Amino acid sequence: MIPSWVSLRAGDYEKIINVRRALSRHGIYTVCEGAKCPNIFHCWGEGTATFMILGEVCTRACRFCAVRTGNPRGYVDWGEVDRLVEAVRELGLKYVVVTSVARDDLPDGGASVFAAVVKKLREVGCVVEVLVPDFGGSPASVKTVVSSGPDVFAHNVETVRRLTPLVRDRRAGYERSLSVLKYAKEFGAPLTKSGLMLGLGETFEEVVETLEDLRRADVDIVTIGQYIKPSGSPRHLNPVRYATPEEFAKIKEVAVSLGFKAVASGPLVRSSYKAYSLYREALKNIVYLG
């Protein structure tokens, strides 16, 4: 049984309708819908959404994710870039999070599409956060995205080292994800960000080790949330346990002590949870800490 502290919250109904209409009108996908995020109506009720580019079919099959798996066979809808910008204009967004499915069928993993979106959004005055796949570990693809000028470069490690083969697609890797984050900083990303889930069988010590690994990769922002099974499919893992609010608070204390500039840790925290607030907190702490 899901405990009471893992409770879903509603948002402003009128804003929810406005977001849904804008997305439908412009044919834009969101990870909120595709990944069945538990915060969807709360975030939409605040007029925010995380846009998903490069279609809605992922070439990978991670066991925590509800996004559809398949082979897009190299298809890219370049009109998606302009439609996304129009949806952002219509919704009046100033902080935009852009993510994508994994596209192992593309030579650059979709990096050039990310870059095109970032440049367009910067032209209309948006602060942009990208949440990228691992691009097969390609430094060139990471550089393509970073060079386009995102304000935050995010890539999720998802889980601890030991559980990575169980939780993520076989083409993903713990060290590869750390490398992607390191490359981003080396290529000049102003802020980097990562996230992981609890409740998959990890120990407290393994969580701390993962946070230490992320800091060694010079990651600035981290999000920690509870894994919630997105469907009844046997492909999706069952939660081993539900971490308590006290455990999340303790882990946040550890993360802050390790030097992260901003930390979100709680049962319903997801990668893009309160993204703008975390961005501002990180900037403030960079200035404060010199």
UniProtKB/Swiss-Prot annotation:
GO terms for molecular function: 4 iron, 4 sulfur cluster binding; lipoate synthase activity; metal ion binding. Its EC number is 2.8.1.8. Residues 44-261 form the Radical SAM core domain. InterPro entries: Aldolase_TIM, Elp3/MiaA/NifB-like_rSAM, Lipoyl_synth, rSAM. PROSITE patterns: RADICAL_SAM. Signal peptide: none annotated. Keywords: 4Fe-4S, Cytoplasm, Iron, Iron-sulfur, Metal-binding, S-adenosyl-L-methionine, Transferase. It is found in: Cytoplasm. Pathway: Protein modification; protein lipoylation via endogenous pathway; protein N(6)-(lipoyl)lysine from octanoyl-[acyl-carrier-protein]: step 2/2. [4Fe-4S] cluster 1 binds at C32, C37, C43, S272. One of its GO terms (cellular component) is cytoplasm. It catalyses: [[Fe-S] cluster scaffold protein carrying a second [4Fe-4S](2+) cluster] + N(6)-octanoyl-L-lysyl-[protein] + 2 oxidized [2Fe-2S]-[ferredoxin] + 2 S-adenosyl-L-methionine + 4 H(+) = [[Fe-S] cluster scaffold protein] + N(6)-[(R)-dihydrolipoyl]-L-lysyl-[protein] + 4 Fe(3+) + 2 hydrogen sulfide + 2 5'-deoxyadenosine + 2 L-methionine + 2 reduced [2Fe-2S]-[ferredoxin]. Binds 2 [4Fe-4S] clusters per subunit. One cluster is coordinated with 3 cysteines and an exchangeable S-adenosyl-L-methionine. [4Fe-4S] cluster 2 binds at C58, C62, C65. Its cofactor is [4Fe-4S] cluster. NCBIfam families: lipA (TIGR00510), PRK05481.1 (NF004019), PRK12928.1 (NF009544). Belongs to the radical SAM superfamily. Lipoyl synthase family. This is Lipoyl synthase. It comes from Pyrobaculum aerophilum (strain ATCC 51768 / DSM 7523 / JCM 9630 / CIP 104966 / NBRC 100827 / IM2). The gene is lipA.
